[in-house]
């Protein structure tokens, strides 16, 4: 247990982040990050109940000062940037607060969280950063003027960062899922056709578990059968 590498997962309290943290808990010491301490504590108990180890950080990743303070000194061999928020509505119905929330959590937080742990990875000459993006980062849709824009930004950030740090021993991957049956899709009446959070966690783990000489930079995960109607 003492020799386990450490993985930091943001947005870990539910959905994809929770599924990824549970999977990483089998092989890594996991630091789970989210705003909801009760949900994080439940997750930590689940990880520990099967022999894993876990620390909890209650944190709003949109709070720049809090991110720097909370992650100061945190050793991360793996970082999964998963935190995200979405208000899917036409631009004329979108409030300024909703716009800024998506930009701050979906994109700006990537910079602040990554910037907090990347120096340690570079110093050690190894590390892996995984961004959980979206197929919205490669497309557009009605009601996605801001959400899709933030996911396009995730792609540009990830691809540029990969080129900056690959010669320093640090891998950068981005996993772009399609529709996932989580609380994010609660407005859908039928979610049976969607991916599950575990499906996305499988893709994240595939990227992480590749040999050191192999980089899987981009994975797109879609439901095998599209939505009907």
Predicted stretch roles:
Residues 90-91, 98-100:
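Substrate-binding pocket helix/loop in short-chain dehydrogenase/reductase
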Residues 13-14:
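Conserved glycine-rich cofactor-binding loop
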Residues 58-69, 96:
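The beta1-alpha1 cofactor-binding region of Rossmann-like NAD(H)/NADP(H)-dependent oxidoreductases
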Residues 167-170, 174-175, 182, 189-229:
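C-terminal helical subdomain
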Residues 27-43:
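Conserved glycine-rich Rossmann-like NAD(P)H-binding loop of the short-chain dehydrogenase/reductase
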Residues 134:
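Residue(s) in the substrate-gating loop at a strand-loop-helix junction
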Residues 114, 150:
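Active-site helix of classical SDR
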